[in-house]
């Protein structure tokens, strides 16, 4: 995002306080808040849901999105939680950690499967 012209919130707790704590403790694989998927986005198409639960371990976030990127998911407090580069094979970014959730979460597994499929096509 930044290299493409976007900006960041450098420290959410001090710059953009929220009722949602965006940095959870253990267990890291537990979903602690939801994200709303943007209808028509690749993530929405993959998961077929409007809202999913995610874990969270970040103190930075996208402030202004680069013009060439698209939002795929937002948290209830309005933070951008997932982006993509439209027209690319698989240039996605998520603020959560599907690697911690995958052992118990089918949505996380689907994200990894889509990534592997894009890499092998």
Feature roles, as predicted:
Residues 1-3:
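Hydrophobic, aromatic-enriched interface-forming segments
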Residues 6:
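A short helix-turn-beta junction within AAA+ P-loop NTPase domains corresponding to the substrate/partner-engaging
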